[in-house]
Design a protein with these regions (language model features):
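Juxta-kinase regulatory segment immediately upstream of eukaryotic protein kinase catalytic domains
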Residues: 1-16, 22-23
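Conserved N-lobe loop of protein kinases adjacent to the ATP-binding glycine-rich P-loop
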Residues: 27, 37-45
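Conserved N-lobe ATP-binding subsite of Hanks-type protein kinase domains
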Residues: 32
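The N-lobe alphaC helix and its flanking beta3-alphaC-beta4 segment of protein kinase-like domains
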Residues: 43, 49-76
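Short beta-strand micro-motifs within the conserved protein kinase catalytic domain, predominantly
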Residues: 77-88, 96
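Structural motif in protein kinase domains
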Residues: 95-105
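Activation segment signature within eukaryotic-like protein kinase domains
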Residues: 118-119
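Protein kinase catalytic-loop region centered on the HRD/HxD motif
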Residues: 124-134
């Protein structure tokens, strides 16, 4: 997700009358990912955002994939994909930890069990990418 998205424009702003971004989780080549909240029920959510001007709307593709995979093991719940101001926005379940969090917590070391769990999850991800991008 890309640095084109200015975090200051996003933080504490209300989107779709109920979702507010509270803090940056991370960013990639297409946009940014925020921890947020649904102010109607106080549920913490994940808030992904990219500039509407992006050549491809990766978040729309991701939302379609999440909708198609709904209920699958390890698949976060998908709440909403929409447009607001100059942004494409994906609202989904906030998952507990990132791989980076676990790695740092374990002094930059993974056990054999954790490595095997990650390998299985990576195979799942590869399969999902194969289904949607080939």
């Amino acid at each position: 997700m890309s640095s084109e998205v200015n975090s200051e424009e996003i933080l504490n702003k209300l989107f779709f009358s109920q979702y507010k971004a509270l803090g940056l989780i991370g960013e990639g080549s297409f946009g940014k990912c925020f921890k947020g909240i649904n102010i109607k029920n106080n549920e913490e959510i994940c808030f992904k955002i990219e500039k509407k001007s992006s050549q491809k709307t990766f978040l729309k593709i991701e939302s379609q994939a999440l909708e198609n995979l709904k209920g699958g093991k390890g698949i976060p719940d998908f709440y909403l994909f929409g447009y607001s101001d100059n942004f494409n926005i994906l609202i989904m379940e906030l998952l507990d930890k990132t791989i980076e969090n676990v790695f740092e917590k374990n002094n930059h070391n993974f056990s054999i069990k954790t490595t095997c769990i990650l390998a299985i999850q990576l195979v799942r991800i590869k399969f999902i990418l194969y289904l949607f991008y080939s």
